[in-house]
Amino acid sequence: MGFSEWNLIWIDLEMTGLDPSRDRIIEIAVVVTDSNLDTLAEGPVLAIHQDRSLLDSMDEWNTRQHGRSGLTERVRASTVTEAEAEAQVLAFLKQYVPARTSPMCGNSICQDRRFLARWMPDLEAYFHYRHIDVSTLKELARRWSPEVAEGVRKSGNHLALDDIRDSIHELRHYRREFLRMPA
């Protein structure tokens, strides 16, 4: 299956912190699935160059996490700007999904949308205004069916492509075990 308004765009960003007014995007990845959550294509996975002073100002959690994963060094070595990353991702998505048809899919996706609106507005505008936020099902399962929530295993390495794969896997799990729908 190729180009379709029913395809879903999954996105994840890694950032220097949680405040889009002062923090920046340092990694972006996208995956396109069909409506049954079968992967059609994995898009660009890009470390985005940011100034050393910004990287040096990250809080302890981000410094440790992105240092351990190797992302900080990838960002330092990268020559890709936010504008170039945005253009590459848009060019990829236009092969699979018409503009403003796919909800933004991922985990805690509102946070990613806030950063896209600030730093990559053309990409943010490519999405429909709705979301498929896997974290909603996670929170409901934790409250209503804890055994279902406990059945989810994630890589936890906080790299954008791995986080997307984890989110798709997690939604498949909730579809099967929580929503009780066949795959």
From Swiss-Prot:
Residues 8-171 form the Exonuclease domain. CDD domains: Orn. One of its GO terms (cellular component) is cytoplasm. One of its GO terms (biological process) is DNA metabolic process. 3'-to-5' exoribonuclease specific for small oligoribonucleotides. Belongs to the oligoribonuclease family. This is Oligoribonuclease.
